[in-house]
Amino acid sequence: MSNRGRQPSGPPPSRKRETKWSGKPKRYANFGAQSFDTVITGHLTQEQLDAYQRYFRIEEISNFLSVAKQQHKSIVDVLPSAKVDETDHYKRDPSPPPKYDKNGNRTNTRERRVTEALEKERHELVELAASSIKNYMIPSNYRRPSRTVERLYVPVKDYPDINFVGFLIGPRGNTLKKLQEDSGARLQIRGKGSVKEGKSSDGFGSSQTGTDIQDDLHVLITADSPLKISKAVKLVNEIIDKLIFSPQGMNFMKRDQLKELAVLNGTLRETKPFDPEAHEKKQQQQMDITKIVCKICGNIGHIARDCKQNNGKRPLDDNAENEPTTINKKARTDVPPPPPPPPPPAPPSSSTEISKQVPPPPPPPPPPAPSAAASGFATTENYKQGLVPPPPPPPPPPPPPVRSALVNFENNSKVLLTKEKEESGSSELKNTGESSSSSSGVPPSPPPPSSNVPR
């Protein structure tokens, strides 16, 4: 087989893609007076590899910063990316929009952004190396910052219906305070939407600058160590994820915050757990109105007394089942009922029994004897002639005490017996006197004259 008219294709040119980290591979890397291996040939554990990588990167960043300071160059010119020309294979990332402070100076230049990023990375690595490497010595030009600042942006544009500010602050700021206590960092909400319209931003302190207000909504986290900042970022992200991914009606965080707010306001109403037995017992005690039938109109749900067609007459066939029982609210006494009245006496059969049963009227009391001075030696003749007025009539006797019919009956019977005895005795004496006088024939002697009669 011939290859006429064709030239054999040679191997493609070996041209490696250039990047900002391009360069000749080196066996050793020199950072100042120290030399580090770039190829690991020994047997190391994963922890040892991580510790060596942290130590190597810390020394590399420290070398870049010290060289830029000694040569009075920009940190951008010291980095390896400065030696690579902009080609189609490598293009620099676009710069963010410029930001200015209150004096008009730009705060987010390229040099400043790169320096802050390198210092932040070195600070985090130093913290990790100090906790994992025994007898670790920090670089000589390293100065631990007094505080570390982190901005965590909130996805308000993606989820405009969620009130991130309200949930992060919580009822009376308790949620934000709890996040600060758990993480040990200081959290502040900054950016657009952090301040209500019409209110001043002076209440947020001096850190709320014009740049922070114009920035997107974010949580400003400040702490003295990266560990606290990472913990605060984790806690804030957990709250944001709960708000985003919680289904409708299952937002337990909102329920807990509303309950906490009710406790603070004093309007909480505790709900008891559902007890099916108590609910069933309560339903049994209640009257089922579907079983109540009116006897007038025949409808269900009311009794005949409450019927609109009732003209004030109660139907005769109204059962006690349809009428609710009324409770007698009168006070009950423990006094026994009075004894029954005695039976009426039998009618008398003779006149003697009638005379025995009916007591005679009591005799009138004798008139009081008038004194000599008041009467003036009055005699019967004066009374007869009307010279001296008669004495006043006696007062009426007091009414007899109220007694029972049985006691009155017994007393009346006793009085009748005693009077019958007295009458029988007086009649016997009278009969004996009359018999004696008639036998002798002597008339009875007249009564002696009164001493008061004048001579």
Curated annotation (Swiss-Prot):
Subcellular location: Nucleus
Pro residues biased stretches: 335-348, 358-370, 388-402, 443-455
Function of the molecule: Necessary for the splicing of pre-mRNA. Has a role in the recognition of the branch site (5'-UACUAAC-3'), the pyrimidine tract and the 3'-splice site at the 3'-end of introns.
Name of this protein: Branchpoint-bridging protein
GO process terms (BP): filamentous growth of a unicellular organism; mRNA processing; regulation of mRNA splicing, via spliceosome; RNA splicing
Any one Gene Ontology cellular component term annotated for this protein: spliceosomal complex
Family from the record: Belongs to the BBP/SF1 family.
SMART domains per record: KH, ZnF_C2HC
Name of encoding gene: BBP
PROSITE patterns, per database record: KH_TYPE_1, ZF_CCHC
Pfam families in the record: KH-I_KHDC4-BBP, SF1-HH, zf-CCHC
The keyword Iron appears for this protein: no
Source species: Candida albicans (strain SC5314 / ATCC MYA-2876)
Record-annotated KH domain positions: 153-236
Biased composition (Low complexity): 426-442
Ranges where the record places region Disordered: 1-28, 86-110, 189-210, 305-455
